[in-house]
């Protein structure tokens, strides 16, 4: 019925189509999919640029954790261009236009690839796409599912059609409790629906250094003035913004309209208010005097960078009945956000912002000015904003971890795993090698995957916290306790033995510890997966002393040459050993190094001032139980 109605509608409408619409459809139906491979794919479908940005963290985590090809389909032109630009450097990510739910084109794609998972971002429910993927017995999920106030009444009228389609979807990860209730009321199976929170909370945006921000202010030619950014403004909001601006002193106003076709109207408003302005494009041509009151942005893609240097940040679509745009972008750059009363599109986020007092909701000029005065006079809310993102940053990661477990056929994957390690087929096996597959959220064993993490560990962990490495993590007793004590640091444990890796991962999973990753790597391979200045700490506990063949020890001059590259200035190396000669040799070695100094050492750790906070390794506990032997301990600082 759907396809018949679709065909009739297209046939009747085609003669009246404008050329722009014909081009839009032809572009999507004439795509060449010959470069798609007969390999496993995850297909992620986004409607527009908003969903492309929203799903970025999700895409990156699927890409890094699943090791599968990613196919991204996008409905709009701007969304497609944004996705192509975003993933142009990723060989295993392919971006296409969504083929407007054309059954033939969808099957052309499905017949070329081995689809493991279809991810529908927000509520992109296309009947042919869902039916054909379901026919192939591939899993379908909805991520960041949302049923808006406007859509819900329409959907209720179509419930008799929607129910069968919704029941073909394996799982719904919904934004809020109300969205969960609505999708269930429309026919989704209750047990397959979960409120996981809004994926927007899990955003990972571009970061700018202090030098970059200083240079950007110089480019904007704004001197020492404070910056008031009005982002994504809509018709009816600019008048209010201008009235507020006229009440401020020593500010430059930067207006970023949601749609650039409104620029002429905004220019007229500025002139009517007897204010001066320069267009962003004029700044690029060096035609600014540096004295203009306002910068009017006539370019796409610069709003986030502007938020990063702002003193006051307003998000549009909220002073008029639009429903609000992305309130999280200013917060990501640790800016207290101001918005209006119309937040129906971002209602959960708005409520959380107000609850935490990291933003202000205003209805008029007076309230707006008062909010600005409060921001200027009160202490920075960085700590609360950090807490806000920290608590919500794991939404995408948790979805990916769960789906990756479901996707993997353990027997087939295990066969590939054996080949990966031993390059042959064998019937006998180490049972713990196969158990690595049960902990993809913790354990990495593929060298290519680990190399991809180089310089990108902050993306993997979902934050920019300090990174510490433990060489020889054993069964994880030391590192899991260290991670529990230090939730604002990330930890990477290196271990070669399968059983130890599995036991370490089990300890972390049991305690829901998220800031740890385990790599099947040697300590000599640090530069394979760590970039320059990427770590702040290293722990080496009870390494083999290699008596008689000391050249094999891990702590030698070559380790410090590696630390010269991968460790930040003021970074720390912590070393424990029961071997007195090894202890003294390390002390002597550090004396010969210009870039390092010993800031603390003791030959009897358990009777020192460091004993109280010492975390005992498995070996340390066993050794203390069986022997009455002193434990040596050294703290080494990188001073250059």
Curated annotation (Swiss-Prot):
Substrate binds at residues 578, 617-620. Catalyzes the formation of N(7)-methylguanine at position 46 (m7G46) in tRNA. SUPFAM superfamilies: S-adenosyl-L-methionine-dependent methyltransferases, UDP-Glycosyltransferase/glycogen phosphorylase. It is an enzyme of class 2 (transferase). The active site is at 544. Pfam families: Glycos_transf_N, Methyltransf_4. One of its GO terms (cellular component) is tRNA methyltransferase complex. It catalyses: guanosine(46) in tRNA + S-adenosyl-L-methionine = N(7)-methylguanosine(46) in tRNA + S-adenosyl-L-homocysteine. In the C-terminal section; belongs to the class I-like SAM-binding methyltransferase superfamily. TrmB family. Its EC number is 2.-.-.-, 2.1.1.33. S-adenosyl-L-methionine binds at residues 470, 495, 544. Keywords: Methyltransferase, S-adenosyl-L-methionine, Transferase, tRNA processing. GO terms for molecular function: tRNA (guanine(46)-N7)-methyltransferase activity. This is Bifunctional glycosyltransferase/methyltransferase. Residues 1-438 are annotated as: Glycosyltransferase. GO terms for biological process: RNA (guanine-N7)-methylation; tRNA methylation. InterPro entries: Glycos_transf_N, Glycos_transf_N_sf, Kdotransferase, SAM-dependent_MTases_sf, tRNA_(Gua-N-7)_MeTrfase_Trmb, tRNA_methyltr_TrmB_bact. Residues 439-640 are annotated as: tRNA (guanine-N(7)-)-methyltransferase. The lineage of its organism: Bacteria, Fusobacteriati, Fusobacteriota, Fusobacteriia, Fusobacteriales.
């Amino acid at each position: 019925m759907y396809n018949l109605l679709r065909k009739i509608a297209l046939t009747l409408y085609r003669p009246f189509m404008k050329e722009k619409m014909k081009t839009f459809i032809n572009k999507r139906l004439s795509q060449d999919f010959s470069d798609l491979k007969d390999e496993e794919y995850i297909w992620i479908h986004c409607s527009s640029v908003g969903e492309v940005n929203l799903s970025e963290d999700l895409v990156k985590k699927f890409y890094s954790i699943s090791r599968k090809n990613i196919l991204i389909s996008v409905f709009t032109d701007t969304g497609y261009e944004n996705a192509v630009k975003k993933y142009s450097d990723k060989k295993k990510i392919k971006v296409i236009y969504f083929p407007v739910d054309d059954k033939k084109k969808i099957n052309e794609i499905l017949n070329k690839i081995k689809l493991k998972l279809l991810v529908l971002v927000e509520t992109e429910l296309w009947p042919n796409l869902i039916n054909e993927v379901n026919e192939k017995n591939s899993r379908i999920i909805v991520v960041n599912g949302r049923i808006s106030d406007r859509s819900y009444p329409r959907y209720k009228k179509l419930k008799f059609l929607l129910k069968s389609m919704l029941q073909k979807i394996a799982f719904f990860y919904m934004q809020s409790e109300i969205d969960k209730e609505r999708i269930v009321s429309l026919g989704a199976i209750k047990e397959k629906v979960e409120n996981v929170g809004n994926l927007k909370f899990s955003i990972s945006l571009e970061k700018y250094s202090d030098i970059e921000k200083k240079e950007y202010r110089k480019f904007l030619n704004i001197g020492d003035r404070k910056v008031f950014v009005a982002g994504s403004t809509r018709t009816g909001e600019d008048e209010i913004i201008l009235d507020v601006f006229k009440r401020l002193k020593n500010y430059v106003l930067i207006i970023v309209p949601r749609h650039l076709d409104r620029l002429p109207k905004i220019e007229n408003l500025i002139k009517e208010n007897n204010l001066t302005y320069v267009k962003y494009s004029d700044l690029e041509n060096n035609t600014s005097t540096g004295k203009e009151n306002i910068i009017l942005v006539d370019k796409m893609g610069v709003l986030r960078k502007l938020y990063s240097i702002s003193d006051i940040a307003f998000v549009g679509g909220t002073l008029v009945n639009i429903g609000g745009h992305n309130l999280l972008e200013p917060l990501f750059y640790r800016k207290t956000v101001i918005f209006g009363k119309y937040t129906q599109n971002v209602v959960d986020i708005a409520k959380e912002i107000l609850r935490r007092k990291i933003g202000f909701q205003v209805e008029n000029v007076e309230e707006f000015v008062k909010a600005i005065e409060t921001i200027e006079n009160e202490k920075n809310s960085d700590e609360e904003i950090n807490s806000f993102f920290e608590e919500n940053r794991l939404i995408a990661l948790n979805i990916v971890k769960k789906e990756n477990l479901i996707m993997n056929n353990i027997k087939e994957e295990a066969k590939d795993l054996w080949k990966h390690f031993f390059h042959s087929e064998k019937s006998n096996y180490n049972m713990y090698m196969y158990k690595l597959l049960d902990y993809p959220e913790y354990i990495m064993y593929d060298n290519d995957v680990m190399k991809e993490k180089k310089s990108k560990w902050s993306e993997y962990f979902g934050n920019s916290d300090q990174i510490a490495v433990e060489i020889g993590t054993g069964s994880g007793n030391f590192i899991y306790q260290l991670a529990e004590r230090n939730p604002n640091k990330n930890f990477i444990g290196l271990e070669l033995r399968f059983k130890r890796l599995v036991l370490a991962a089990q300890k972390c999973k049991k305690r829901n510890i998220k800031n740890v990753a385990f790599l099947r790597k040697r300590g000599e391979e640090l530069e394979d997966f760590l970039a320059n200045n990427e770590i702040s700490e290293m722990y080496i506990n009870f390494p083999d002393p290699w008596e008689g063949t000391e050249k094999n020890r891990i702590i030698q001059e070559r380790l410090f040459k590696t630390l010269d590259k991968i460790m930040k200035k003021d970074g720390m190396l912590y070393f424990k050993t029961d071997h007195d000669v090894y202890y003294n040799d390390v002390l002597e070695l550090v004396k010969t190094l210009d870039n390092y100094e010993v800031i603390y050492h003791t030959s009897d750790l358990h009777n020192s001032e460091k004993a109280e906070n010492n975390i005992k390794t498995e070996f340390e506990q066993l050794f203390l139980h069986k022997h009455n032997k002193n434990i040596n301990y050294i703290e080494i600082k990188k001073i250059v």
